[in-house]
């Protein structure tokens, strides 16, 4: 009986080895090819391009460039050509949108004095500022510190210290009370009486 189990184990092990050998693709032995650019024999095989056996990729250690056997030679600079952005001293069009624009226009009262109109682009229609009742288009840019200085009174909403509602978590209309007994329908941006 013991001979039968050992024979079965041997048969199973030999079948597993045969199956493992069949699953591994036999890769051809890679020879040292000459570089098509500089004809240097100092090359090495890297990998198969996209795991395709018909497109082996090679690297020339002399000119430090890659090529695919049978592929077109591309004029790629040494080092692969980087896409790093250069540090530019000039301003780009996108940075001009972030800067303040100042337009001078004459006074209509005829006094000859000129006033400057300042506006910060991107702040005119800020939905977060509208949601919390902060001034929209404020050139001074009311900040979070100015909100704290106002004792958390956001556009007439008063934060109750006993509730667990925090600004920014949700609307929390059950734990927020208006000082003048009206509430704001934020979706329609209109005032209604209770």
UniProtKB/Swiss-Prot annotation:
ZnF endpoints (Dof-type): 33-87
Gene name in the database record: DOF1.7
Intrachain disulfide bonds: none
Entry-linked Pfam families: Zn_ribbon_Dof
Residue spans of biased composition, Low complexity class: 88-99
GO MF entry, a single one: DNA-binding transcription factor activity
Residue spans of biased composition, Basic and acidic residues class: 104-121
Its biological purpose: Transcription factor that binds specifically to a 5'-AA[AG]G-3' consensus core sequence.
Subcellular location: Nucleus
Positions with a binding annotation for Zn(2+): 35, 38, 60, 63
PROSITE patterns per the UniProt record, alphabetical: ZF_DOF_1, ZF_DOF_2
Protein's UniProt name: Dof zinc finger protein DOF1.7
Family annotation (InterPro entries): Dof (IPR045174), Znf_Dof (IPR003851)
Biological process annotations from GO: regulation of DNA-templated transcription
Record keywords: DNA-binding, Metal-binding, Nucleus, Transcription, Transcription regulation, Zinc, Zinc-finger
Region described as Disordered: spans on this chain: 74-125
Gene Ontology cellular component annotations, sorted alphabetically: nucleus
């Amino acid at each position: 009986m013991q001979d039968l189990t050992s024979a079965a184990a041997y048969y199973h092990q030999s079948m597993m080895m045969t199956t493992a050998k069949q699953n591994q693709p036999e890769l051809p032995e890679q020879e040292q090819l000459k570089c098509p650019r500089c004809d240097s024999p100092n090359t090495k095989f890297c990998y198969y391009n996209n795991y395709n056996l018909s497109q082996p990729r090679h690297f020339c250690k002399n000119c430090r460039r890659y090529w695919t056997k049978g592929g077109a030679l591309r004029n790629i600079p040494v080092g692969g050509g980087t896409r790093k952005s250069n540090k530019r001293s000039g301003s780009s069009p996108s940075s001009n949108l972030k800067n303040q624009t100042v337009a001078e226009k004459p006074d209509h009262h005829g006094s000859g004095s000129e006033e400057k109109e300042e506006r910060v682009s991107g702040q005119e229609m800020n939905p977060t500022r509208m949601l919390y009742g902060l001034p929209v288009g404020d050139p001074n840019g009311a900040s979070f510190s100015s909100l704290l200085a106002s004792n958390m009174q956001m556009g007439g909403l008063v934060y109750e210290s006993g509730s667990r509602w925090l600004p920014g978590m949700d609307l929390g209309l059950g734990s927020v009370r208006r000082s003048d007994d009206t509430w704001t329908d934020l979706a329609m941006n209109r005032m209604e009486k209770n």
